[in-house]
């Protein structure tokens, strides 16, 4: 759905805006140099009664004697620039008449990333992004009661990058040794391996270009039916979106040498080639992908106030969605929704909502789910007894709601009400025979088992809240308590043992979970003068979730491996807090801890320097 600003009545207005930005990491780890690194290694050898091995290298590295043989490489600096940059130019044209209003926006965006490149190479593996955006909105009044709107937008984007993972490049740069070999020898050779020489990994392995395009369209027609009754409207919406992307990968690799062992009498580096590279760039098309989405919606709405006190509104909506991403079958959903609300004298509010949603993921007769909800509210600040406090308490509202929502996205599995039959290559070894089992044949095997009674996952949600405004809106406070209970969670029936003969674990609507908590939001807005406005906003949230029912193996139930009764994603295992110090011990020699420090039952004798673990369940021991 496209929802952007609309054109306004008036002469054409043209706005051009140019922006430039430079970005850089706020903080990077500081690494010791090669000489200090080797000195620490020598110190470890000395402390363990061994002879140091880097004494000569340390002296020559500090003296910058021969950077080829005694390098000192900051690998993060070698693969990255000081900053990245981006530029954007936007042109906005809008205007219109009482009958036709329009808005047109076009933008060009360029970005250059932080990765370095080898300027001696004709090709560039550094990160670059170029995007062209266009969006137009038109409002056409076909009659005094008929409004046609259409929005069309899209973009073209080209992204250039290295063929390697950027995160992996930096991960390796962070932990690479600074003294083994330089990023590149002064004579041009590259030492190490494709993985250990991070500079080569970032700059010598080729490049890839990804092109993407997207078009979004939305058409709506709204008819005011006030000639039937005031406040009645009907609206139809049609949307069509399309997205496509593809990547061309041009891979290569350089000749790789072992680290130089010295220099000849003529002063040349003594290098031996370890691996031959490639003199050409490969060509591979990857990542070709596209999606298509169709959306239709019809809405009947009503909004009217009777006798200045009785505000009544309602809405009925039907929608259908079709989403195709090139799989065997597209995704389809459809449903209805409704809302009815009543407000008396601007103070007492009641609302009822429902959703009647359908999903292809369920069998016939079970595809639709009905999910109602209701809410009530009381605007206390509108009461007559609150008027003397109006300047201080500008708003006080109490509200409560309860309702249901449904989920048909069942762990990404489609049509789980049907059994599947798979090629045995996927689930079982094929049948082998002959000399050294050299002959084989695939067969068919049972895949996923059907869940004929599969139904919607349901969430019951309850909420009570307070909204408080002070000093004519200068302070706005919201407080909410919420409680969510989820049931019919689709999960594997892990209590069924393997000996039952299932190739894959059966699934079912079995699980239950609860989520409870509170949220506080505070906004402070102050206009000091016409040139100074200050706004502060803060949010504090506390939430606790717990698995209340989960089908688990019999060997797990009742043990510390059980997930029932714990938050989802609960960490398992020990959590390191810090290292023990002398101050933690009542008797260092005996390994006796001071009172109040949890004992670690799995260690025969503790010493300063051992890892101190967190007592997660507060039982006074780590076991």
Q: Which residues make up each language-model segment?
A:
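C-terminal beta-signal and adjacent terminal beta-strands/loops
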Residues: 24-31, 35-39, 79-80, 391-394, ...
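Hydrophobic transmembrane signal anchors and adjacent membrane-proximal interface regions, especially
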Residues: 56, 121, 127, 232, ...
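Flexible glycine-rich, low-complexity coil/linker segments exposed to the extracellular/periplasmic environment
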Residues: 28-76, 175-203, 248-292, 423-449, ...
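Extracellular/periplasmic, surface-exposed regions of secreted and cell-surface proteins
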Residues: 83, 137-146, 152-156, 161-167, ...
């Amino acid at each position: 759905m496209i929802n952007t600003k609309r054109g306004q009545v008036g002469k054409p207005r043209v706005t051009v805006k140019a922006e430039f930005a430079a970005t850089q990491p706020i903080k990077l780890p500081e690494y010791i140099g090669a000489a200090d690194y080797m000195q620490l290694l020598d110190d470890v050898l000395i402390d363990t009664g061994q002879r140091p091995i880097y004494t000569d290298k340390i002296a020559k590295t500090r003296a910058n004697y021969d950077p080829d043989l005694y390098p000192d490489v900051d690998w993060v600096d070698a693969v990255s620039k000081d900053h990245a940059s981006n530029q954007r130019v936007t042109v906005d044209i809008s205007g219109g008449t009482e009958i036709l209003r329009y808005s047109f926006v076009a933008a060009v965006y360029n970005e250059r990333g932080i990765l370095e490149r080898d300027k001696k190479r004709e090709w560039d593996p550094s990160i670059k992004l170029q995007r062209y955006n266009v969006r137009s909105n038109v409002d056409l009044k076909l009659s005094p009661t008929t409004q046609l709107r259409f929005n069309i937008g899209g973009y073209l984007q080209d992204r250039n990058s290295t063929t390697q993972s950027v995160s992996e490049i930096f991960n390796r740069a962070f932990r690479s040794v600074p003294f083994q070999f330089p990023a590149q020898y002064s004579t041009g050779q590259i030492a190490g391996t494709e993985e250990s020489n991070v500079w080569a990994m970032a700059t010598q392995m080729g490049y890839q270009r990804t092109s993407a395009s997207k078009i979004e369209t939305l058409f709506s027609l709204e008819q005011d039916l006030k000639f039937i009754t005031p406040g009645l409207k009907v609206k139809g919406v049609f949307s069509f979106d399309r997205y496509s992307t593809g990547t061309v990968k041009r891979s290569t690799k350089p000749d790789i040498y072992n680290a130089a062992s010295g220099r000849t009498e003529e002063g040349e580096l003594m290098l031996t080639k370890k691996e031959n590279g490639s003199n050409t760039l490969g060509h591979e098309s990857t990542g070709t992908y596209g999606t298509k989405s169709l959306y239709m919606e019809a809405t009947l709405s009503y909004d009217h106030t009777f006798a200045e006190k009785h505000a009544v509104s309602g809405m009925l909506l039907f929608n259908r969605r079709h989403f195709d991403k090139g799989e065997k079958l597209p995704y389809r959903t459809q449903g209805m929704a409704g809302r009815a609300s009543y407000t008396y004298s601007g103070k007492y509010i009641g609302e009822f909502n429902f959703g009647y949603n359908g999903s292809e993921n369920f069998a016939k007769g079970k595809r639709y789910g009905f999910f109602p909800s209701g809410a009530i509210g009381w605007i206390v600040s509108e009461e007559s007894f609150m008027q003397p406090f109006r300047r201080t308490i500008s708003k006080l509202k109490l509200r409560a709601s309860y309702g249901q929502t449904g989920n048909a996205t069942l762990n990404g599995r489609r049509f789980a009400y049907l059994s599947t039959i798979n090629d045995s290559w996927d689930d079982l070894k094929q049948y082998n025979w002959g000399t050294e089992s050299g002959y084989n044949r695939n067969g068919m095997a049972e895949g996923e088992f059907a869940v004929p009674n599969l139904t919607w996952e349901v969430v019951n949600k309850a909420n009570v809240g307070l909204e408080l405004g002070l000093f004519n809106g200068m302070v706005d406070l919201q407080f909410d308590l919420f409680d969510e209970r989820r049931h019919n969670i689709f999960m594997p029936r892990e209590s069924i043992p393997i000996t039952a003969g299932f190739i894959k674990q059966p699934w079912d609507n079995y699980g239950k979970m609860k989520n409870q908590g509170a949220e506080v939001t505070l906004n402070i807005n102050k206009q000091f003068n016409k040139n100074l406005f200050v706004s502060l906003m803060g949010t504090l949230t506390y939430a606790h979730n717990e698995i209340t029912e989960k089908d688990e193996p019999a060997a797990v139930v009742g043990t510390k491996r059980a997930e029932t009764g714990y938050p989802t994603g609960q960490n398992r295992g020990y959590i390191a807090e810090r290292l023990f110090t002398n101050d933690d011990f009542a008797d260092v020699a005996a390994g006796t801890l001071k009172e109040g420090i949890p004992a670690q039952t799995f260690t025969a004798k503790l010493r300063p320097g051992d890892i101190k673990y967190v007592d997660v369940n507060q039982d006074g021991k780590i076991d």
